[in-house]
UniProtKB/Swiss-Prot annotation:
GO CC, one annotated term: extracellular region
Identification of the protein by name: Beta-lactamase CTX-M-1
Domain of life: Bacteria
Keyword list, A-Z: Antibiotic resistance, Hydrolase, Plasmid, Secreted, Signal
Hydrolase listed as a keyword: yes
UniProt: a beta-lactam binding residues: K76, S133, E169, S240
Impact after mutating N107D: Significantly reduces catalytic efficiency with respect to cefotaxime
Lineage: Bacteria, Pseudomonadati, Pseudomonadota, Gammaproteobacteria, Enterobacterales
Matching InterPro entries: Beta-lactam/transpept-like (IPR012338), Beta-lactam_cat (IPR045155), Beta-lactam_class-A (IPR000871), Beta-lactam_class-A_AS (IPR023650)
Length: 291
């Protein structure tokens, strides 16, 4: 009886010590990550915002997560999601074709410019917006759902009170410091991206389609993805604008692990500053190290 009690006590004590000792590296690691992000930001000369959600345990790493950042083309995820949501009640919607005119062309239209005087389906426009960041495609999607205010209204339906889309392409990319137009916070975008890609914000087939399009993105190799192990699967949407604004938002599938949601926003004080995708890659490496 005494031996059994002693054994139970020993096991409990060992477990307690393990938990106590284990908690020290956890807190230390959190502080270490914050310090590394702060140092990355200092060296970059800009302002960095990061939000990571580990869906395995709902733990988060947050850095300037409630500050506003210009979304630039990361807002295309919300516009496409709004169209997908609409398609739930209109089954043939994605096959609907939209006319492309020369007057529609703006500063970046790698896919749409090939269809001038022709048409593209809403599915094709969605893929072009997400996978090639085509700005004509984005504008057509925004127009289809009723304008920027309607995209914002869709975000509100999802419970996102921070996202706001005020303009179309390319003016939504001005990213003027302190300008609230076309902005969100890393925390808000991370939660919304989780709801859209892993949650119940969209129907099963619509969610699967969004994820498929994001996995097929062609613009993100030097951003978040560059800071991750090669075996991890990434679906992302990049964005860039004035003031060297450089963004990427991603849903990530580590090998044999639960998915991660990662939002990285970066902007600089100089209007003509160069994009810094390397900063996003470094941030991704810092927050996922050890996972």
């Amino acid at each position: 009886m005494v031996k059994k009690s002693l054994r139970q006590f020993t096991l409990m004590a060992t477990a307690t010590v393990t938990l106590l000792l284990g908690s020290v590296p956890l807190y230390a690691q959190t502080a270490d990550v914050q310090q590394k992000l702060a140092e990355l930001e200092r060296q970059s000369g800009g302002r960095l915002g990061v939000a990571l959600i580990n869906t395995a345990d709902n733990s988060q790493i947050l850095y300037r997560a409630d500050e506003r950042f210009a979304m630039c083309s990361t807002s295309k995820v919300m516009a496409v999601a709004a169209v997908l949501k609409k398609s739930e009640s209109e089954p043939n919607l994605l096959n609907q074709r939209v006319e492309i005119k020369k007057s529609d062309l703006v500063n970046y239209n790698p896919i749409a410019e090939k269809h001038v005087d022709g048409t593209m389906s809403l599915a094709e426009l969605s893929a072009a917006a997400l996978q090639y960041s085509d700005n004509v495609a984005m504008n057509k999607l925004i127009s289809h759902v009723g304008g920027p205010a309607s995209v914002t209204a869709f975000a509100r339906q999802l419970g996102d009170e921070t996202f706001r889309l005020d303009r179309t392409e390319p003016t939504l990319n001005t990213a003027i410091p302190g300008d609230p137009r076309d902005t969100t916070s890393p925390r808000a975008m991370a939660q919304t991206l989780r709801n859209l890609t892993l949650g119940k914000a969209l129907g099963d087939s619509q969610r699967a389609q969004l994820v498929t399009w994001m996995k097929g993105n062609t613009t993100g190799a030097a951003s978040i993805q560059a800071g991750l192990p090669a075996s991890w699967v990434v679906g992302d949407k990049t964005g860039s604008g004035d003031y060297g604004t450089t963004n990427d938002i991603a849903v990530i599938w580590p090998k044999d692990r639960a998915p991660l949601i990662l939002v990285t926003y970066f902007t600089q004080p100089q209007p003509k500053a160069e994009s810094r995708r390397d900063v996003l890659a470094s941030a991704a490496k810092i927050v996922t190290n050890g996972l």
